């Protein structure tokens, strides 16, 4: 059966960027059609990404915290793992959120078309669904088609023992020996889950550090905390994987790589994602898509075709849901006639590992590469009352200031709940705040969050919770 729909705005993809664009456009009085290949809204993030991974990370945290309490006088028995119940709980979390999105979509009178959509011209999209095709004629389009996992040619990807992040979240079993190929955020998060559930986890990373985007000192703290949990192989690459009945035999290459093949029960491939620009036939609408699949846009999120916009992973790094949401609002508002540009000073990044790593703005490495005149202030959590009371003193809070003006250029936190704390630094960077603004803000005590204010006091020279390197020297 073939249907035809005419609309003012069509949004291609219903991830965080897509549904946010659709909802914002509807709130601004526009007729909106939202096209999604999945049966539920939310895209990769909600269905097979951000949300289910955080549910499983919560399980991992409870297991690890319970074990850690033994040294503080509280001993629990060995946890009994019921994978069916864990999976069921994870699916309940997803269902609650997707159900909420479905309800909000109906309340806003956004029409959802389920199926895979492709452009057939600069004014039409053809959607192929299980119940037939739908032709959508539009005045404006927003491409929010996201990204896909990258496959490696030397990996037997058709072997069920080789999984990507989606497969890892299915939690079919807990392998005894697991290799995580890629030491980025996704790989480390899933490695954290499987380690807590009982797997021996090895991580191989081609770069000389895990999470290459973060500063080395932040990652070093993570490494030191996890050196007994993971077998980490840096500056190492996988060159071959041989599938045998009893396991996957991996050949490594690198200065510290194992000389012989190593057997694993399962391999998680987490080497990044690629944009889906070519999958939606954007070229048939006249939209320029580069060879990698990215679509170039203006600050208004316009493509080279003025009435077609693009947002999210498909327009470039960083591939983050919160970036996509803000781009979505911008595109919808521009279509409605408002003046709006996507021009953030900073976009936060968080690794929901244990400990968490979070950073925003200019990193110390980037500042040095750019020749910026900076001063770095580090507050060690070994001096934090809350961290000591929580038996988690491994962390630190780091602030990066412009040396002459004191303006906050960036910051990073490593430690428990680092991601929840990062917002203050993000706001400081976005608003152009300086160290005095942050230091004179009264932070509650005892909290981990007060470490941000204390780092600012280090720069200001007013710190009293640590020896003050800027204190006035007294005459003898």
Residue spans for each PLM region:
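Glycine-rich flavin
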Residues: 2-7, 23-31, 36-174, 207-211, ...
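Short glycine/serine/threonine-rich phosphate/pyrophosphate-binding segments
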Residues: 17-21, 44, 162, 187-190, ...
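Rossmann-like NAD(P)H-binding beta-loop-alpha module
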Residues: 172-214, 320
């Amino acid at each position: 059966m073939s249907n035809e729909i005419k609309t003012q705005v069509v949004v291609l993809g219903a991830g965080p960027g897509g549904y946010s664009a659709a909802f914002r456009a509807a709130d601004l009085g526009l007729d909106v059609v939202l096209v999604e290949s999945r049966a539920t809204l939310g895209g990769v993030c909600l269905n097979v990404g951000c949300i289910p991974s955080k549910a499983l990370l919560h399980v991992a945290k409870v297991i690890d915290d319970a074990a850690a309490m033994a040294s503080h006088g509280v001993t629990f028995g060995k946890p009994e793992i019921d994978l069916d119940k864990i999976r069921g709980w994870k699916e309940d979390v997803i269902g609650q959120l997707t159900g909420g999105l479905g309800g909000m979509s109906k309340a806003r009178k956004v029409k959802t078309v389920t199926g895979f959509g492709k452009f057939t011209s600069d004014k039409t999209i053809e959607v192929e669904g299980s119940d037939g095709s739908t032709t959508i004629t539009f005045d404006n389009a927003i491409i929010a088609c996201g990204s896909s996992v990258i496959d490696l040619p030397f990996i037997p990807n058709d072997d069920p023992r080789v999984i990507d992040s989606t497969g890892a979240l299915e939690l079919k079993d807990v392998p005894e020996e697991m290799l995580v190929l890629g030491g980025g955020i996704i790989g480390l998060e899933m490695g954290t889950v499987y380690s807590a559930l009982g797997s021996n986890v090895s991580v191989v990373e081609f770069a000389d550090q895990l999470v290459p985007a973060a500063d080395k000192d932040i990652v070093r703290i993570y490494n030191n905390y996890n050196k007994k949990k993971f077998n980490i192989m840096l500056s190492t690459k996988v060159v071959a994987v041989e599938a045998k009945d009893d396991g996957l035999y991996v050949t490594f290459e690198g200065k510290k790589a194992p000389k012989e093949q190593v057997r694993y029960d399962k391999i998680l491939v987490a080497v990044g994602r690629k944009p889906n620009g070519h999958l939606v036939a954007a070229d048939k609408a006249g939209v320029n898509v580069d060879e990698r699949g990215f679509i170039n846009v203006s600050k208004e999120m316009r493509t080279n075709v003025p009435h077609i916009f693009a947002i999210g992973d498909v327009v470039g790094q960083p591939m983050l849901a919160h970036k996509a949401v803000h781009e979505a609002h911008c595109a919808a508002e521009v279509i409605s006639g408002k003046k709006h540009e996507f021009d953030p000073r900073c976009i936060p990044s968080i690794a929901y590992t244990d400990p968490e790593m979070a950073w925003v703005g200019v990193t110390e490495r980037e500042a040095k590469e750019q020749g910026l005149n900076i001063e770095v202030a580090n507050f060690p959590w070994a001096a934090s009352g809350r961290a000591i009371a929580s038996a988690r003193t491994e962390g630190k809070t780091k602030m990066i200031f412009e040396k002459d003006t004191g303006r906050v250029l960036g910051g990073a936190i490593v430690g428990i709940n680092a991601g929840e704390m990062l917002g203050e630094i993000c706001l400081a960077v976005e608003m152009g705040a300086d160290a005095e603004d942050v230091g004179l803000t009264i932070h509650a005590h005892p909290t981990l969050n007060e470490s941000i204010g204390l780092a600012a006091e280090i720069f200001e020279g007013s710190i009293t919770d640590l020896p003050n390197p800027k204190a006035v020297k007294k005459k003898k």
